[in-house]
Design a protein with these regions (language model features):
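Short beta-to-alpha transition helix within the HATPase_c
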Residues: 8-25, 31
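Conserved short strand/loop->alpha-helix "switch" segment adjacent to the catalytic nucleotide/phosphoryl-transfer site
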Residues: 9, 27-61, 65-70, 76-83, ...
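Glycine-rich/acidic phosphate-handling loop/turn and adjacent ATP-lid/helix
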Residues: 92-120
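C-terminal end segment of the histidine kinase catalytic
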Residues: 142-160
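ATP phosphate-binding glycine-rich loop and adjacent ATP-lid/helix-beta elements
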Residues: 110-137
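ATP-lid-like helix-loop hinge signature
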Residues: 66-93, 138-144
Length: 160
């Protein structure tokens, strides 16, 4: 991803490409769901961290695309703007924080971290591999669709 060093990946280039692959494969735009990526600065990671991070982000974005906007909700609120956003940047201590935020129906009281679905097992495993803490909350900007959901991944400087 445009790096002369093949072991280093710039997330500002890599993560938008992960999102593009989801757009091509799952076509969320055809359902009225807009995906967006904001990585506020150049964040370079070793490939050993960047690849599992990309898989983790992909799983969280796909989960939002599949579950945050059920068809009946999109039909009921056709003028609503369905969004899934990926936001990334550095923390004060030079760690990394990434959030996947949607303005969909929300979790409805379900705690996904207690589930043993393949997706949640994958999210937990990749988080552990990265030495990261992952949390989820109801979104802070309710929409016509519901409360939304926010997943936040914090990776300490040096990761593992």
């Amino acid at each position: 991803y445009r790096s002369p060093d093949l072991d280093i990946i710039d997330l500002a280039d890599y993560l938008p490409r992960v999102i593009e692959e989801i757009e091509m494969g799952y076509r969320p735009g055809a359902r009225g769901i807009a995906l967006g990526t904001v990585v506020s600065e150049e964040i370079r990671l070793h490939i050993d961290q960047a690849i599992p991070l990309g898989l983790l982000i992909s799983e969280l974005v796909l989960n939002a695309v599949k579950h945050a906007f059920p068809a009946e909700v999109l039909v009921e609120y056709p003028a609503g703007t369905a969004e899934v956003r990926l936001i990334g940047g550095r923390t004060e201590d030079e760690g990394l924080v990434l959030s996947v935020v949607d303005n969909g129906v929300g979790l409805g009281g379900i705690d996904p971290s207690e589930r043993d679905s393949f997706g949640m097992v994958l999210v937990r495993t990749l988080s552990e591999q990265l030495g990261a803490e992952i949390t989820h909350t109801d979104g802070e900007a309710p929409s016509v669709f519901g409360t939304g959901t926010q997943w936040t991944l914090q990776v300490r400087q040096g990761g593992r």
